[in-house]
């Protein structure tokens, strides 16, 4: 099916949605910004209520380019990187630690900057040459890992962890197709 890809992340407790975020998606989406889709929000609320589920839920959707319909194409009962949309929201922890005390649905702040992975954006710039788009993304967003007060995770991921993984694949002769900085792994051919 061809069309627009969308993703959500939700925390539910006994059928009630406690936290919710959504975004435009793509394979290995590495840039996150809340889009506040009313249609998807209603779908997630209805699903959680009807199933009385508790836990973390990640849904992927496709809006068909042929009929305009929204189709739910995947559900993963786990944390998703869409959770990064809450990077500046202090209330998210409450959904995990004290779900019964959550009074209203926790959503990313409307003025929250989108999240990106810097080296992914550099590769995008080098492969597309879209300087204005790159600058807009980098200047208006925040890096998922970099924090000026604690740069070690950023340095460790990009200059130690990923290079060691690449060297391992080169040394063992295992072919790879991409580096996924979001989850800190080298995706091998035939892998996920």
What are the residue ranges of the model-derived segments?
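Glycine-rich phosphate/pyrophosphate-binding beta-alpha loops
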Residues: 25-32, 76-89
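Domain-wide signal for the mature, well-folded portions of proteins, strongly enriched
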Residues: 14-16, 25, 33, 50-51, ...
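Short, solvent-exposed secondary-structure boundary motifs
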Residues: 1, 49-52
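A general structural signal for well-ordered alpha-helical packing
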Residues: 41-44, 58, 72, 76, ...
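Conserved metal-phosphate-binding beta-hairpin within the catalytic cores
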Residues: 10, 51-85
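Phosphate-binding site of ATP-dependent enzymes
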Residues: 1-45, 62-72
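Peripheral (often C-terminal) accessory segments that flank ATP-dependent C-N-forming ligase machineries
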Residues: 95-192
């Amino acid at each position: 099916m061809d069309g627009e890809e969308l993703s959500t992340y939700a925390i539910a407790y006994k059928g009630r949605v406690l936290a919710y975020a959504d975004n435009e998606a793509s394979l290995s989406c590495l840039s996150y910004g809340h889009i506040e889709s009313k249609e998807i929000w209603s779908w997630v609320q209805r699903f959680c209520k009807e199933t009385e589920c508790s836990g973390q839920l990640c849904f992927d959707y496709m809006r068909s380019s042929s009929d305009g319909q929204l189709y739910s194409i995947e559900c993963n009962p786990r944390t998703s990187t869409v959770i990064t949309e809450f990077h500046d929201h202090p209330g998210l922890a409450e959904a995990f630690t004290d779900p019964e005390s959550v009074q209203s649905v926790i959503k990313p702040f409307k003025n929250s900057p989108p999240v990106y992975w810097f080296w992914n954006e550099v590769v995008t710039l080098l492969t597309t040459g879209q300087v204005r788009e790159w600058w807009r993304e980098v200047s208006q967003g925040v890096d998922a890992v970099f924090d000026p007060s604690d740069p070690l995770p950023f340095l460790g991921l990009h200059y130690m962890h990923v290079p060691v993984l690449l060297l391992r694949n080169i040394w063992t002769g295992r072919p790879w197709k991409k580096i996924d900085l979001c989850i800190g792994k080298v995706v091998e051919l035939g892998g996920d």
